[in-house]
Amino acid sequence: MRQFPSIRGNINEKMMTTMVESQTRSPWRTPVPYLFGGLAAMLGLIAFALLLLACSYWRLSRQTEDEEKQTESGEKVVAKAFEEKILVIMAGQNNPTFLATPVAAKICLDCVNMEKKEGQNGESKVTEENH
């Protein structure tokens, strides 16, 4: 009869080499460290945003307390007036055709007062009254 070579010897050698390879394998080949690293970075970013919100709220509440103390002590609080800046760009064919800025409307209380009064038939009449 014919004799076959020993299979057990080859299997043991292969198992030993795979065990050695798995032990020397880099842990960064799996996605788990990247997953936890990304999760930690996201939680850090959220914590930083919450810290910024808490600090801004604290600063805002401190400013309102200072204003309340000034009004209680009788000091005159000067309101800060900021000019609203609005810019409107009207579209053109190639370039904007013009720029527009808002103009404050001047209302005169002594001017002519226009009032609508309904007539008997439901028609509206415009009357002018001078004050």
UniProtKB/Swiss-Prot annotation:
Disulfide bonds: none annotated. Residues 56-131 are cytoplasmic. The chain crosses the membrane at residues 35-55. It comes from the Eukaryota. Keywords: Amino-acid transport, Membrane, Transmembrane, Transmembrane helix, Transport. Its main location: membrane. Residues 1-34 are extracellular. GO terms for biological process: amino acid transport; regulation of amino acid export. GO terms for cellular component: membrane. The keyword Transmembrane applies. Expressed in the vascular tissues. Also detected in guard cells. Belongs to the GLUTAMINE DUMPER 1 (TC 9.B.60) family. Overexpression of GLUTAMINE DUMPER 5 leads to free amino acid levels accumulation and plant size decrease. Probable subunit of an amino acid transporter involved in the regulation of the amino acid metabolism. Stimulates amino acid export by activating nonselective amino acid facilitators. This is Protein GLUTAMINE DUMPER 5. The lineage of its organism: Eukaryota, Viridiplantae, Streptophyta, Embryophyta, Tracheophyta.
